[in-house]
Amino acid sequence: MTLWVLGLNHQTAPMELRERASFVGDALPRALDSLRNLPNVNEAALLSTCNRTELYAETTNAQILLNWLEQHRPGLQNHLYQYRDAAAVRHLFRVATGLDSMVLGESQILGQVKDSWSMARTHGTLGNTLDRLFQHGFSVAKHARTNTRIGANPVSIASTAVRLAQDAFSPLNESTVLLIGTGETIQLAAKHLSEGRVQRLLIANRTHAKAQMLASQHGGYALPLTELNLHLAEADIIFSATAAPTPIVTQSNVESALHIRKRKPMLLFDLAIPRDIETEVGTLTDAYLYTIDDLERAVEENRRSRREAAETAEAIIELQVKRYMDTLQAHAHQAPLRRLRTFGTTTRDELLTRARQQLANGRPAEEVLEQLAHGLTNRLLHPPTAALREAALANNTELVRAAEQLFPEKPGYHHPTLQTTIVKTDETDPAS
């Protein structure tokens, strides 16, 4: 059987196609149930996120997987990538580590890979091959993240701003944060802030219903934008990212808020273009203003740091791929080795039982031992000897060379039968 990965991601397909390709809600367990019934597919797992849909499977025929995908998610063929065996192993390790993510080094993907593994196990599509692969992938991701700084620094504007806020007002559970707007940047900031257990979260927006929805998701309080100035003084930290054409937080607003706060410092992040906060706010004592340009410099430095860490992580993954494939190779040879050992022990036990019976019947020990030795020799050597003769007649030099490696010729010792057979083959084989 062969290990395959078929999938698409943010690099190969646009958002609308990724949405159509995803398996969410009840669709995922139904898909796994369908995969379990496919012929010649021993194991399967589905990884489905907003940025990727991937099918991991053990099968002799990748076309079966392609046909299944076309049936369940038509129109993806031109956007799919396919990886096999070592390339498939490498791909999973890179995905779990965050090296294949839209945001380099992001950690959320590891949890999503674990969910994929867990779901496949629950629905009976996970066997020894994929279980071993995913478990090894988890270890590789942990090792890479522990031994590099691949995920150490934030690489989005929102996460960088939250990190600066955490550094300035630590801990956040003693701070009040005001978010202005409900767009993607503010949503991401709200997520990071709620993870940091901010004490109080206020959300102001022109459309109050959107503010209420975001507030309900993160345990905050919604405000109409018209009441912004009434609550400005309550905020230790302000994040603003709206589409307003002119600033909505003015120098005079902040000056009044600082007066009410008795000059207790305020930290303000203007994440909007055009700006939401007047630049003059940055000139006020006890008001610390950061703009997108300020944050972008920090973000780029963090990205550079992650790119450097990614090079080290890639080297770790290459080493782990080799080790994993070596382990698979070793496992592949276990079955014939077990059969060889079973053949040897069974032969030994059978002839030993016969010898003991002969001794019990009064047969001379020397005769019994000699017969036992001859019997063992003949029984154990007959199968490989016959196989080597057939190999020589068929000009199968690979098997003959393997035998020569196992039993190297010593000085003064010859294998006349084997040598004669090989010479005969060379002389009589018209193809040689």
Swiss-Prot record:
Single annotated GO MF: glutamyl-tRNA reductase activity
Pathway: Porphyrin-containing compound metabolism; protoporphyrin-IX biosynthesis; 5-aminolevulinate from L-glutamyl-tRNA(Glu): step 1/2
Keyword Transit peptide listed: no
Reactions this protein catalyses: (S)-4-amino-5-oxopentanoate + tRNA(Glu) + NADP(+) = L-glutamyl-tRNA(Glu) + NADPH + H(+)
Gene Ontology biological process terms, A to Z: protoporphyrinogen IX biosynthetic process from glutamate
Region (Disordered): 410-432
Binding site for substrate: 49-52, 101, 106-108, 112
Residue numbers marked as site, Important for activity: 91
Pfam families, alphabetized: GlutR_dimer, GlutR_N, Shikimate_DH
Keyword Oxidoreductase attributed: yes
InterPro entries for this protein: 4pyrrol_synth_GluRdtase (IPR000343), 4pyrrol_synth_GluRdtase_dimer (IPR015896), 4pyrrol_synth_GluRdtase_N (IPR015895), GluRdtase_CS (IPR018214), GluRdtase_dimer_dom_sf (IPR036453), GluRdtase_N_sf (IPR036343), NAD(P)-bd_dom_sf (IPR036291), Shikm_DH/Glu-tRNA_Rdtase (IPR006151)
Enzyme Commission number, as recorded: 1.2.1.70
Protein keywords: NADP, Oxidoreductase, Porphyrin biosynthesis
Positions of disulphide bridges: none
Active site: 50 (nucleophile)
Binding positions for NADP(+) per the UniProt entry: 181-186
Quaternary organization: Homodimer.
Extra remark: During catalysis, the active site Cys acts as a nucleophile attacking the alpha-carbonyl group of tRNA-bound glutamate with the formation of a thioester intermediate between enzyme and glutamate, and the concomitant release of tRNA(Glu). The thioester intermediate is finally reduced by direct hydride transfer from NADPH, to form the product GSA.
Function: Catalyzes the NADPH-dependent reduction of glutamyl-tRNA(Glu) to glutamate 1-semialdehyde (GSA).
Family of the protein in this entry: Belongs to the glutamyl-tRNA reductase family.
Free-text comment about domains: Possesses an unusual extended V-shaped dimeric structure with each monomer consisting of three distinct domains arranged along a curved 'spinal' alpha-helix. The N-terminal catalytic domain specifically recognizes the glutamate moiety of the substrate. The second domain is the NADPH-binding domain, and the third C-terminal domain is responsible for dimerization.
Matches recorded under PANTHER family: GLUTAMYL-TRNA REDUCTASE
Protein name stated in the entry: Glutamyl-tRNA reductase
Lineage: Bacteria, Pseudomonadati, Pseudomonadota, Gammaproteobacteria, Lysobacterales
Gene: hemA
